[in-house]
């Protein structure tokens, strides 16, 4: 059975040893898209399939997926999910997240045509591993060339490492900024970039950037970090929806800060 801490150690070791790899995440949003369910995050509500509820989402978190309009993006996401390649790691949801449950974990395994060595935890860098991400992994970025796919509202000037190239995206970026994946791939090819780390904080667009980029060139590392750096980027949405972040940065006592995900 896969182990949450050991899986983190594996990626950390690869970064320390400058062994290039890709880590792409299929969290709950990607799960719903794969399942062909409507997905909307708006200012004060969300829709997932037939379920509508209230929550607060700031502009950088807004997204929309309507099955009747956006099948080409779902098809691309399926392609990224089904793809297998050496050192191409795909994080999926587990039943440890109550709103996901074992039924959806089993669904993802089945949709993937079975478990695989390259499947891992979508939450690998967050929850109980988040403190290690901040304190052990982020310092390793200082000595690496960093490319960053990040929201246009983010202020990257306070990050503890330098960014050599930034690719800015807006709201609903999977659809509105679909072409960024090609731009990242072309930039790497044209500049001869090698042994850089490409950080992605671009919702489901991250899956496209990482898949296209690593499939084309395995000489760089592609890392989907989601909202992990948002407290350092001057963004506010994490304070309302990310317990692992409020637990670490605001001492909120959120149980997500202690959650060790289990492979089931």
Question: Residue ranges of each PLM-predicted region?
Answer:
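Electropositive, gly/pro-rich neighborhoods at or near active sites that engage anionic ligands
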Residues: 1-161
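A short, acidic, amphipathic alpha-helical segment used as a generic capping/interface helix at domain edges
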Residues: 7, 72-77, 179-189, 205-207
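Short beta->alpha connector loops
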Residues: 30, 203-205
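A generic structural motif
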Residues: 51-54, 166-173, 223-229
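Long, contiguous secondary-structure blocks with strong helical propensity
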Residues: 137-147, 196, 243, 256-263
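A mid-sequence, solvent-exposed acidic-amphipathic segment
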Residues: 158-196
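Short catalytic-loop micro-motif centered on adjacent basic/acidic residues
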Residues: 197-201
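C-terminal functional extensions of proteins
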Residues: 205-264
